[in-house]
Amino acid sequence: MKPKPLPSFHDLNSVFEISTTSPSGLIWKKPTCTKQKVNQPAGHMRNNKYWYVSFNRQQLLVHRVIYFLYHQTDISNVTIDHIDQNTLNNSINNLRISTHQEQQCNKKGKQNSSSKYKGVNWSKSLKKWRASICVNKKRMHIGYYANEIEAAKAYNAAAEKLHGTFAFLNDV
């Protein structure tokens, strides 16, 4: 899904300020309605676990506003990734530009898998744990392993090599 273009830097900067004390990461500099107060947290959380802020009848993702205000660079055609996968953590140190593919590398594994580790599943026919990884939308076989942890370690090594800082590493 392509993100909505943001209003101008001047417009956003006149109303919002980045704040480490606000749960959303933004405070009101100049409220746009009577419910809002100067220096109070700006934004509301939605079911999908992202912070949003209302501005000129438009719902904006707070992490995109923060990145734009801090870096003052056009982000209309890029994805902003939460490094720690916590979409509520809008600290500027937790936000980075990424491609859609890089963002997919930084996600946890599927919840309905036969393994609790990303990139690992059980092969019924071989009775071994299989490690695999996606590269350029193609599944790449890493190997078969006697135990789940060894397969997870093999996945981690491949993920670090292939995805670098965007790799999601299993906790083993």
Give short role names for the model-derived ranges.
Residues 1-51, 55:
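Short helix-coil boundary/hinge micro-motifs
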Residues 31, 56-139, 160, 171:
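Short, cationic Gly/His-enriched loop motifs
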Residues 146-162:
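A short, charged, amphipathic alpha-helix used as a generic interaction element across diverse proteins
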Residues 166-169:
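Beta-sandwich strand segments
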Residues 138-148:
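A short, exposed loop/beta-hairpin motif centered on an aromatic-Gly-Thr core
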Residues 48-50, 137-140:
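Short, solvent-exposed beta-strand edge segments and adjacent coil->beta transition regions
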Residues 4-7, 98, 146:
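Short coil/turn linker and secondary-structure boundary residues
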